[in-house]
Amino acid sequence: MKKKIAVGCLALAATGATLLTSTAHADYKVIATNDLGMHCVCMGFDTFVLLPPFNTLRAQLIQRGEDPVPVTDGSRFKVTYDIVQNTEASLKADPYYQSWVTNAPKLFPGFNPVAANGKYQGLTGSQLRGEMTPDSQGAMWEVVGVPAYPDMSSNSTTAQKIMTDPLGGPNRNPYLTASVKAYDRATGALLAQTTTVVPAAFGGCCGCHLNVAKSYGYANPTPRDSFNVMGMLHAQNSSHINIATIDPDHDGVPGPIRCSQCHLDPAMGESVAPGYAGYPVSQYTFSDVLHRWHAQNSVVLTNYDPNIAKDCYQCHPGNNVNCYRDGHTTSTIGSGSSAHNIWCTDCHGDLNQRIAQGQMLQPWSDTTLPKCATCHSNTGEGGGYIGGLFGKYLNSHGHRNDKILCSTCHGEPHALNPSTLAADNTQNIALQGLANPIGVCDTCHTGKSSNYGTPPH
């Protein structure tokens, strides 16, 4: 069973990325996207982990013609991917990533982050470069679980390193580049190639929790100090469990622990929380307890504001990253004093409202995630639906009898085209000369118009 790991992290920053997007063969086009628009990952793994390095890429290889078709015959075609900035050498020199390499077997017993060939691998066995897997049901090629990580090396330009480190380390590039190429398997001929953004960023947990540790007497708190304070506070809830005393590997040093071990997180690819021996499993999901604590706990006293910069970006990657970066950010709704650009809460709902309605008890579900049809008409959303996590938009097909993924033309959630991040737009500009969603017919249809329009869904 495929694991799906992600976080709904919601980029107003043009990077200095140099991306090559071109078509190698006039008869084929390959269009690649990330599955979420942003993946969160922890900056250290010695004490606890919310999310490990885990990224997913999708691509559709389209054979052009009067009636173009996506092709997924693995015996005839090969589609490869390469995370350009992440190399074995750069990750070996990255102390945060090496913390993952050391602690991953403790967090996920039976898993080795180093494959038999000596290369780094993700939880599903996917590496930083390799072949994508054809999916005939989804009419796409996919690689799940790539261990992509924000880059601090010289593989990224200074302009790309827009993400600051709450622990004081060097800036990092949260918008990596994936090079995707399609080949004729028999002849090795290059049929098409493109590039797309692979996002991976740190959340805002440390920036706040180090200050919490200071308020409990730690003058210059470390992540371990912060973990100890969180454990003490966790013991004050109804579970009475001090998570900072759990020692899963019995080496005499508490941690590392995984939050979803006791609080179910479907994004980890699990249907039940595995639990720790001697400790009860919670009835509440990880999404529920995390958001409910920060929204309602009398100690935290968080005052929520619908403006993402004052609310969501305190936890989800904000500051220089601003991971909600698509065309909706420049669309205005409301009138008068209530007029504003579209915020997270306009699609997802106010956090307190979501908690009250029990949405966090069904995280990542198409029953609780936003739907395009709430505001837009004739979306085709739900057509050719292949199910799975992360909602109807990501897993639906439209256009030409439900052959094309919505994201192939429109981009991934939170980075819909045109995006405010220049790198997100490079692929569409190369394909049709515009950053807009794919709308020039002869991109795929031979003999059709080269003018921009709105294709039927």
Model-identified regions with their sequence ranges:
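Inter-heme linker and motif-flanking segments adjacent to c-type heme-binding CXXCH motifs
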Residues: 186-192, 213-249, 266-457
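Bacterial N-terminal signal peptides that target proteins for export
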Residues: 1-9
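Extracellular structured ligand-interaction cores
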Residues: 54-56, 76, 172-179, 200-205, ...
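Contiguous segments within soluble domain cores/interaction surfaces
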Residues: 28-165, 175, 200-202
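Ser/Thr/Pro-rich, low-complexity mucin-like regions
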Residues: 151-201, 212, 265-268
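Short, solvent-exposed linear motifs at loop/edge-of-secondary-structure regions
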Residues: 34-74, 169-186, 285-298, 402-417, ...
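C-terminal segment of classical bacterial N-terminal signal peptides
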Residues: 15-23, 411
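Short S/T/G/P-enriched beta-strand
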Residues: 25-57, 62-78, 82-88, 188-249, ...
